[in-house]
Amino acid sequence: KYLMAGKAVIHGVSAHSGNNYLAGRNAILEAAYKVIGIQALNDLEKGTHMNPAIVRGGTVMNAIPDSCELDFSGRFPTLAEVERVKEGLAKLFGESTIEGTHSEYTLSAARGGLEVTEEGKRLRRFVDSVSQENGWPAVGEVVLGGGSDAGYIAEMGVPILCSCGVRGEWNHTDREYALVESM
């Protein structure tokens, strides 16, 4: 899948949360609406996954926060889905739910797409046959979450298989493990 990352800064108006509550415009609250909007861009049936991942904002408990930062990423099966989400993000960050707030955002270029090609299917069939000739099961086809470095090679038009390494689970979490016997 293609991978794209984004960063946003939401600007509000600081004020004392007791004495001047109505003068403030809460940037964190506006960011919460943005998080919900980012999540709404998911299309799980197509395989598009949006992840609002990091939120930073506020300075003290008795002040309405005037700034909030939001980091997010997305994984996409096709460039058409990348474009759909880009349009949705432009609309989302171009509007405000809380009057007096505004947002700016940047996106990285979508990278690393690994779309299924005839050449890739041919390579997988070859690997399956070699595997079976040596008494191992066929590798088969599994669709994973995306953002693989294999996508860089695929972008050059070279057929490639992804995730043919050591077996394990829970990548990039504190539960991640690898099975030594699969090495």
Residue spans for each PLM region:
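Metal-dependent amide/peptide-bond hydrolase catalytic core
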Residues: 3-183
